[in-house]
Swiss-Prot record:
Lineage, broadest ranks: Eukaryota, Amoebozoa, Evosea, Eumycetozoa, Dictyostelia
Protein name listed in UniProt: Putative uncharacterized protein DDB_G0287963
Length: 47
């Protein structure tokens, strides 16, 4: 998910996730509901 070349989440995206103001609309190529909890999204995307 939105990773740079070394595989880390860019600071601007990470900060947006932490603030709760950023809802990615895809996860592993599949659509996700914008109501999915941010913590759950981050947990699933930290694999």
């Amino acid at each position: 998910m939105y990773r740079n070349i070394v595989g880390t989440i860019p600071d601007d995206v990470d900060n947006a996730l932490k603030s709760g103001n950023f809802f990615p609309n895809t996860k592993n190529g599949y659509p996700v509901k914008s109501t999915e909890p941010i913590a759950e999204m981050k947990k699933l995307n930290n694999n």
